[in-house]
Amino acid sequence: MALSPLLGAYVIACFRDPVRYALPPYAVLIPFGSSFKVFPGAFGGISSLLGLLLGAALLIQLVTTRWGSARIPLAIPVWLAFLALSGFSLFWSIAPGATFLDLRILASNVVLLVALVLTRFDHRTLRLFATSLMAGGVAVVGYGLVQMTLLGGLPGKRTGPGDGPPRFGDDLLGANNEAAALLLPLAVAASRTLTESGRSRLLHGAATLLLLLGILMTGSRGGLLSAFVVFAVVLWLGIAPRARKAVIATSVVVLIALALMFQPFGFGRRQVENSTNSSGRTDIWMVGAQACPLYCLGGAGWGAFPTVYQQELSSTPEARVQPRGATFEPHSIFLLAVIEVGLPGLVIMVLGLAVALLSAWRLPAAMRAPPMAALLGTCVSSFFLSNINYKFFWAVIAYVAVSETVAAATQERAEPARPAVGGLVPAQQEVQ
């Protein structure tokens, strides 16, 4: 109760300027998932509550003021169409309860994406957004190191059924999704290490190494592969001397190689020891392929893949029965889309990702590297993860779309004003 006045003042500040006061803490808490619970349920964590506050404040601002973005990126109607199709799937879903529960999460992410893109951003607030995302990644890796060194070790898996030794992120988003959540912060930090100078370069270089360490701590092979993609794109598109790019590339390769060879504190051990093990993904994908003739055309309903898996597992003798039970995620957003919302849903989702990639590619050279690197890295990780309902996936889509609107606004301000049609300026008469 003593904090009620401060909390009330903060809420008022968020409604007055949501980009400045609500967005940064929300972005920082994204990699922590629902760790800090206030209420039970999918939206009971502090991160989700901040997301609801941010979304409400942005929507009220959009209703009461002029839209900040004069241009709506094509990604917005595409993802709204995906949401609409997922919502309509409730009418034919084989698991309507699961569809309704998952649809709430998807809708909250898409609505927040739309509100962010329609809000007034400039280069300063875009940098604040990116810095907050990077700070969240650094903070969660620091949290993991504290768990390992001061709190008796990593606590193990809480996000779902599982076995094996504990991995960093098991109690947050799940280890593999935790690695994917660090890709956007890694892209921002690595790009700034490449392009900035002095103390800023040193700070962002340290953040880059810490984020890379966090990905190694998760033991995620797909996360490590995606991190390589992020680094490759940053080095390719970043504006910096070739010598600096060569030094950074060599340093990253050497550090990762040393970590995988010597495995200090066990970091990198899982990536090496399980390099040829699919961890059951191929068996799950075989079950999905078995179900495709039934559901790939119209879909089984959003969120219905676990039910499909239970139904089709006995009909897929070549798929091993996993020791963790029969309720599984598809471990690929592409398999998820085609089974749950059919071929139309898969086409819309691929179109949304393609539009985002095209938008990132068309950004000015000085802005292009972080969004492009984060998006490509996320696409690679999403081939192995069904992470479309996670906030970090939509943070990447939002970062690309907001960067597009900022670049478009900057270009419009830079263009000379053109006379209106019918209001031509007469030529000056020559002085005799």
Segments predicted by a language model, with ranges:
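Long extracytoplasmic/lumenal interhelical loops at the membrane interface
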Residues: 265-286, 294, 298-341, 363
